[in-house]
Amino acid sequence: MESYDDDLSRFEAEGAVPLPDTTEQGYVENDGARIWYATYGSGSPVILLHGGLGNSGNWGYQVPALVRSGYRAVVIDSRGHGRSTRDARPYSYELMASDVLAVMDRLNIEKAALVGWSDGACTALILAANAPTRAAGVFFFACNMDPSGTKEFEFTPIIGRCISRHRKDYAALSATPDKFDEFSEAVGLMQRTQPNYSANDLAQISVPVAIVQSEFDEFIKREHAKYLARNIPNAEFIYLPSVSHFAPLQRPDQFNAAILAFVSKVLS
């Protein structure tokens, strides 16, 4: 039986399970940043894009499930996150999407399914909007596409545990280990002002999309998720009960089942 981590106490103490060993990892230089990536398994590619302040290690429960199911799992540390660097420019999802394309080019991946969590979901959908031939589909979990989609911030113990783990990981992985607060402030500025897609912008998205919303998401309004599903052509809405913004860590089996059902359709 799966052991739940609904309050993230295990994640705060230990992190997610470690990513598997791989011989295929490295860096790609792109537009003022050095972007770290790693790949696992073989088969059709699925790119996992983590959330704000996190790193690829947050996908420790998802990578093995994808590999077992016959997919090639690719993780990327977003610019300025984890092992990746950044320049002095403000963060933007457009820049992050260009970083993903640079990794795809390095790995000779013409087209992939994109699984995005929070900021990673925004990055994935913007990539799909800008370069639809590169995206087989987008699994869009727990993010907004305009500023009206976010709830008023309310600190909770679960959020505190997540930030505590992110702070520890940043100190261990980053080239600027003592700059977490400045990093957090820069990411927060991006999150407050971006993205800002109109309903017409959403209507232009032409790839398969699943809008995935958890029952207790601390940051994203459920009505916004449903609005996205209505306005993106042929998008599906997936509801995850009993979990929050941190579903991939809280109940991995439930989250993995939703990912696998989606990628099996878009990569068939």
Pin down the residues of each PLM region.
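Short beta-strand/loop motif that positions the catalytic acidic residue
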Residues: I205, I211-Q213
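Active-site loop/oxyanion-hole signature of alpha/beta-hydrolase fold enzymes
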Residues: R68, V75-V115
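Alpha/beta-hydrolase fold catalytic core
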Residues: M1-V46, Y71, S264-S268
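Catalytic active-site module of serine/aspartate enzymes centered on a nucleophile-bearing elbow/loop
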Residues: P241-S268
